[in-house]
Design a protein with these regions (language model features):
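N-terminal module of bacterial RNA polymerase sigma factors
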Residues: 1-30, 37, 126, 148, ...
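Internal acidic/polar
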Residues: 2-5, 91-121
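Sigma70-family region 2
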Residues: 13-14, 40-41, 51-68, 87-89
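Arg/Lys-rich amphipathic alpha helix in sigma70-family domain 2
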Residues: 61-65, 75-95
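Amphipathic, non-transmembrane alpha-helical scaffold segments
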Residues: 24-28, 74, 114, 118, ...
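Structural recognition of an alpha-helix C-terminal capping motif at a helix-to-coil junction
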Residues: 33, 47-54, 67-79
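Short alpha-helical segment immediately N-terminal to, or the first helix within
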Residues: 23-25, 34, 137-139, 144
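DNA-recognition helix of helix-turn-helix
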Residues: 82, 124, 132, 138-141, ...
């Protein structure tokens, strides 16, 4: 039985600890994989996931209902991932011309390098501008509606749809290249 978001919210108001556990149970794995696709490395994804749920716990009483609970959770997760990426970019000094996320992908022991197409797909996604990357991941992997994506990335549904389609075109072009 899956518990719906309204039940989670009413439980959280009556018993914040229990409500928080319900949110973790429902969204924990999805949040980890959403963050993982953005930051690439397993350890970074674990850290950002933990920070996401700490932030959720601290701010549960501030949820206004402007967007769905799913969108709110993903927005906080996205912000944590982007915060981590921003901190990392400030400290990165590279001689390698590839994006730092691609370099981390290559160093991650949790990635299956025998599936070259999957690795190439991840490289293509990591090379996208942030909004396109977010729109693509949220639509393709998480199967969210454009309205939810818009709430998460702070845009309109039309802009989210445009970002997704631009990302898809760039990924197809990258996948068809000989690189």
């Amino acid at each position: 039985m899956t518990i719906n978001d309204n039940d989670i919210l009413s439980t959280a108001k009556a018993d914040p600890d229990k409500g928080f556990r319900l949110i973790m149970d429902k969204y924990g794995e999805a949040v980890y994989w959403h963050i993982r696709r953005l930051v690439s490395a397993h350890a970074d994804a674990q850290d950002a996931t933990q920070e996401t749920f700490v932030r959720l716990f601290r701010t549960m009483d501030k949820y206004r209902g402007d967007c769905s609970l799913t969108s709110w959770v993903y927005r906080i997760a996205t912000n944590e991932a982007l915060r981590l990426i921003g901190r990392r970019k400030e400290s990165d000094v590279r001689l390698d011309t590839r994006a730092p996320e691609v370099c981390r992908l290559a160093a991650d022991g949790y990635v299956d390098y025998t599936d070259l197409e999957a690795v190439k797909l991840q490289e293509a996604i990591l090379a996208l501008p942030t909004r396109q990357q977010l729109a693509f991941n949220l639509r393709y992997y998480d199967e969210l509606a454009y309205d939810d994506i818009a709430c998460i990335i702070g845009s309109t549904a039309a802009a989210a749809k445009a970002n997704y389609h631009l990302a898809k075109e760039k990924i197809i072009e990258y996948m068809n290249s000989n690189d």
